[in-house]
Amino acid sequence: MAGQSEDPSLERHFKGHRDTVTAVDFNANTKQLASGSMDSCLMVWNMKTQMRAYRFVGHKDAILSVDFSPSGHLIASASRDKTVRLWVPSVKGESTAFKAHTGTVRSVSFSGDGQSLVTASDDKTIKVWTVHRQKFLFSLNQHINWVRCAKFSPDGRLIVSASDDKTIKLWDKTSRECIQSFCEHGGFVNFVDFHPSGTCIAAAATDNTVKVWDIRMNKLIQHYQVHSGVVNSLSFHPSGNYLITASNDSTLKVLDLLEGRLLYTLHGHQGPVTCVKFSREGDFFASGGSDEQVMVWKTNFDAGSYPDLLKYRQNDTFPSGGDYTSIVQPADVHQPARNAHVTQAADLEPHITEMSVKDRSSPLSYTSRSVDQHHPQAEDGNLQTVASTLEHIVGQLDILTRTVGILEQRLSLTEDKLKECIEQQQATVPPSHSGTKKSSF
């Protein structure tokens, strides 16, 4: 039986969204967590306790996808308002938006090198963009229904997409051709992603299943029927040995891909779980749901064998559970009681600073102070509020100074023109005579 110390546990419980949480993602150093919601807001949560959260306001409709850039300097968000926004997660709240599609944008994702974006939309297309200046590169157009999700492969050579046409398509980025279609799902495919090795893909579907394909052999190698509701999202552990899934049945499931079995069922959300994501190192994962909550869990279960998992990654192999692996709840694995870990978690409602959007026509600067880079003496909420207010005042004073300078220049020009007019007038008027000529008789 697994020891208690190896069970995943709920570490944080963030409250602040006003509607269903639709997407979550950690930055590279796991110091921040971004979440998007049907409330149209992007939240950035600081993992360090007692630090404020930030609400970024700019989208005009629901946010359906968020993704941190590999460097952590940018966050991309996709919205029902048909736009994609790039945010600098700083106290300035800078953002740039571009109209990406003619329909709802369901998905946005950075490439591994952080230079490209891929978006998926209800307009049935997938589009690829440069991050710098958001230049459109090309579109992929073979789906015949809404495209729910699109992701780059780890090496950036391939793109995988999932659609309501019940297909998953694999695309070659260079040739821009569809090189494989998988049509084995009984329902719509909500989410798809690459295994960290790039050799497999996993998909979550409305028929309550999770399927894993080997894209080298174009073969279904694992088939999980462990949820009793629609599967909304999934995430691979960076080791490649575990897969976590989120479902409308209110649970998260941890799957052991090496052994082809269900490892844990996690309860915590009060309603459908809509999104889940491992941190870059795999030591945490976050989930969001229709209960408007963001939960951060400590992984724990990979601690004892992590070196072996990394070795597995290096060998670039992937476990096959046969043609189909039917999964049942194992009797020898500790199953935490419903909400057992929730009471142990920090139930946080941090002070939230709302950042109204400041759209930029020029490229975003990455040098702004990040929202997690506070000095110790500024971590107190009141001091941060004062600092933010002072920064705003300084900005306004700078604007006033520039305005006064412009007015002084205009006044000086006016004075010069007036002086010139007076001089010209004096030069054209003949001198007048003061005396009058007397007539003689």
Swiss-Prot record:
Q: Where are the WD repeats?
A: 16-55, 58-97, 100-139, 142-181, 184-223, 226-265, 268-307
Primary location class: cytoplasm
Q: What CDD domains does this protein's entry cite? A: WD40 (cd00200)
What are the boundaries of the region Disordered?
347-376
What cellular-component terms does GO give this entry?
A: centriole; ciliary basal body; cytoplasm
Q: Name one GO biological process term.
A: cilium assembly
Basic and acidic residues composition bias: residue spans: 348-361
Q: InterPro entries per the record?
A: G-protein_beta_WD-40_rep, WD40/YVTN_repeat-like_dom_sf, WD40_repeat_CS, WD40_repeat_dom_sf, WD40_rpt, WDR55_POC1
**Gene3D superfamilies associated with the record:** YVTN repeat-like/Quinoprotein amine dehydrogenase (2.130.10.10)
* Disulfide cysteine pairs (residue numbers): none
Could you tell me the keywords of this UniProt record?
A: Coiled coil, Cytoplasm, Cytoskeleton, Repeat, WD repeat
Q: Which residues form a coiled coil?
A: 400-427
Q: Where in the cell is it found?
A: Cytoplasm, Cytoskeleton
The record, for Pfam families, names:
WD40
Function of the molecule: May play an important role in centriole assembly and/or stability and ciliogenesis.
Say which family it is in.
Belongs to the WD repeat POC1 family.
Subunit structure and binding partners: Interacts with pat.
- Name of the protein in question: POC1 centriolar protein homolog A
Name its species. Answer: Xenopus laevis (African clawed frog)
